[in-house]
Amino acid sequence: AIAVELARDVFEAIQTLSRGSVFQDMPLVSNKELMDLR
């Protein structure tokens, strides 16, 4: 559970920092990776 929460925090931080950048094309992949952690 802790790992999932950590991943969520990191994911949110990356999304916030990289808006308008290359990561804009990768949200679906990142979401899939988060789902796999559960």
Curated annotation (Swiss-Prot):
Q: How does activity depend on temperature?
A: Thermostable. Retains activity up to 100 degrees Celsius, and when exposed to 121 degrees Celsius. Also retains activity after storage at 4 degrees Celsius for 4 months.
Q: How is its activity regulated?
A: The antimicrobial activity of BAC79 was completely lost after treatment with enzymes trypsin, pepsin, proteinase-K, and carboxypeptidase, while there was no loss of activity with either amylase or lipase.
* pH-activity profile: Optimum pH is between 2 to 4. Active from pH 2 to 6.
Which GO BP annotation is one of this protein's?
killing of cells of another organism
List cystine links: none
List the keywords (alphabetical): Antibiotic, Antimicrobial, Bacteriocin
Coiled coil residues, start to end: none
Q: What does this protein do?
A: Has antibacterial activity against a wide spectrum of Gram-positive and Gram-negative bacteria, including L.monocytogenes which is inhibited through disruption of the cell membrane.
Protein name stated in the entry: Bacteriocin BAC79
